[in-house]
Regions:
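Regulatory and interdomain segments flanking nucleotide-handling catalytic cores
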Residues: 1-2, 6, 14-332
Length: 332
């Protein structure tokens, strides 16, 4: 409802939620909890700390501190627009101006008027937000690095919130205030998430087994086919588990990562879905293509690498599960 959405916007920070007179199952408790997880996953303190906030701060390049670098590149004020080309980071002075923020707000407002608050429009909303928020920093604090976009922060918040809601629903835990606000620290230790991955094997052989005549066109066609097929597989799975593309972390090269809720229902659905996809691949491509699926259980603290090394261990666990599936493709 409109009131639920307004509550999620108004009270997504704990300082505003603390004194609010709200029902114990108000969805804003989930939003606040998810926003905190997204924040401690993407916000890190800068080496040179200054006090206060500065709304003129541009989005920095993630490569500034990669591998010990000390770069100073950032992005120009720009919405995603194919006509303007790629917005490469620059070391030239850049300040986020007020008129740019007004343009962004107006474009989002205009697009919201044409979007219904229904399931099929969720991904359309994500597209609108991506176009407008990709080059806006999620934090303008002088004490923090500003290399994570507001779009990525909002997307992660939505992904986490949808997982938390399903996780609590399966456990019949409806007192969100107690679980996610009053006892948030202990809930950070609960295995709420699944880092889920799918990986298609046989891609190289499939793409390059084309006749010499028209080889280039054939290579492009097969590569495009695999890309579209993978996106379709992702969308179908997300629909079956009642999630959106906000939960898609990465997709490319026949591989993807998704953030899913750690529920028995999701595990049942993903297991059946993997079997169905591989049966379809066998029927259409014999044993040429195969999809391996695996996951690792994660807590909110895992997403901020606490304890140290747990974030890397999560991805290693997923990789080991995929390797095991590929080594034992078919069972009698």
């Amino acid at each position: 409802t409109d009131s639920e959405i307004l509550h999620c916007v108004k009270y997504h920070h704990g300082k505003y939620l603390a004194g609010a007179d709200l029902k114990e199952n108000d969805l804003c408790y989930i939003t606040c909890f998810a926003d905190n997880i997204a924040a401690f996953a993407d916000r890190r303190e800068a080496d040179l700390q200054e006090a206060g906030f500065d709304k003129r701060i541009p989005l920095d390049s993630v490569f500034n501190i990669l591998n010990g670098n000390q770069g100073n590149s950032h992005y120009a004020m720009q919405r995603l627009n194919p006509a303007m080309g790629i917005n490469y980071p620059t070391e030239e002075p850049v300040e986020m101006e007020e008129h740019f923020y007004r343009t962004v707000v107006q474009d989002i407002t205009d697009n919201l008027r044409g979007i219904s608050l229904e399931e099929e429009y969720v991904n359309s909303l994500l597209t609108v937000l991506e176009a407008n928020l990709t080059y806006i920093p999620s934090s303008t604090s002088r004490k923090e690095l500003s290399d994570i976009s507001l779009y990525d922060h909002v997307k992660i918040t939505a992904a986490v919130a949808s997982c938390v809601e399903q996780y609590l629903e399966e456990r019949n835990q409806n007192n969100y205030r107690e679980k996610l606000f009053e006892n948030a620290v202990s809930t950070y230790e609960e295995p709420i998430f699944l880092l889920y991955s799918m990986d298609i094997s046989g891609i190289q052989k499939f793409i390059y087994s084309v006749a010499e005549a028209g080889a280039l066109k054939g290579l492009r066609a097969r590569s495009f086919y695999l890309e579209i097929m993978m996106e379709h597989i992702i969308d179908e799975l997300l629909e079956q588990v009642s999630l959106s593309r906000a939960n898609l972390i990465y997709s490319g090269g026949g591989h993807c990562y998704l953030l899913l809720p750690n529920t028995d229902e999701v595990k049942r659905i993903t297991e059946a879905y993997e079997a169905d996809i591989n049966e379809w691949l066998r029927q259409n491509f014999d044993i040429e293509l195969y999809i391996a699926c695996g996951y690792a259980v994660a807590t909110p603290n895992t997403l901020r690498n606490e304890p140290r090394g747990s974030y890397e261990e999560m991805y290693l666990t997923v990789s080991e599960n995929l390797s095991g599936k590929k080594a034992h493709r078919y069972q009698a």
